[in-house]
Amino acid sequence: MSAQADRVMDLSEWENRWQEGRTGFHRSDVHNLLKANVDKLICGRREVRFFFPLCGKAVDMKWLADMGHTVVGVEFSEKGIKEFSQEQNLEYNEEAVADIPGAKLFKSTDGKISIYQCDLYKFSSAVAGHFGGIWDRGALVAINPCDRQKYASLLVSLMSSDCRYLLDTLEYNPELYKGPPFFVSEDDIKTVFGGSCNIDLLQSVDGFEEKHRSWGLDSLTEKLYLLTTKTQ
């Protein structure tokens, strides 16, 4: 991480990406690693509450909701949230969030999907309780490297005792590309989550796409981990 340790993006930069349509991080289909490992995430449970950090307009939220689960996301960009509702043909209600000044809650009328529009670090279990599942795709790899411990502490605080947390990461040569998305190694994960969580590598795949050449890369590996609380 050393080559990227000082790289910092503020929320306005992310908002600008949404406003300018520079959302290459968005996938129009359900993530292949989620589909391949969803049974390990659900683990035979019904009506699981899932948390999506920095959810954007991930179609994975609707996919899990359609299975009978409920989803709570946090996203800073209101534009991203409204695009999600429009693209998924969801009617929603909008309300203020008492515990987070200035935040808004966008909740689908069927109650299956709730998205908080706010700074992730102002969110807490006091706002929305604990979760039995977390799908972290494009979140840990997007936050500033200097904030990883703060991020991990927040995510652990949201985990119920039986929570199953799928974490998607990217590995490449960080000397060649400054991010985001940032390089995250297994050692990085152990550093910030190892004290509280068991960490198991589920899958490692070649994630290189042609667009990555414009980043100056010629290889990229995508890895999926399962995190569970050490109390399990």
Curated annotation (Swiss-Prot):
Broadest EC class assigned to this enzyme: transferase
Residues given in the record as S-adenosyl-L-methionine binding sites: 14-25, 54, 75, 137
Subcellular location: Cytoplasm
Annotated catalysed reactions: S-adenosyl-L-methionine + a thiopurine = S-adenosyl-L-homocysteine + a thiopurine S-methylether
Cross-referenced Pfam families: TPMT (PF05724)
Swiss-Prot/TrEMBL GO biological process terms: methylation
Name used for this protein in its record: Probable thiopurine S-methyltransferase
Residues binding substrate: F25
Keywords of this entry: Cytoplasm, Methyltransferase, S-adenosyl-L-methionine, Transferase
EC number: 2.1.1.67
GO cellular component, one term: cytoplasm
GO MF entries: thiopurine S-methyltransferase activity
Principal subcellular localisation of the protein: cytoplasm
Gene this protein is translated from: tpmt
InterPro entries linked to this entry: SAM-dependent_MTases_sf (IPR029063), Thiopurine_S-MeTrfase (IPR025835), TPMT (IPR008854)
Entry similarity comment: Belongs to the class I-like SAM-binding methyltransferase superfamily. TPMT family.
PROSITE patterns: SAM_MT_TPMT (PS51585)
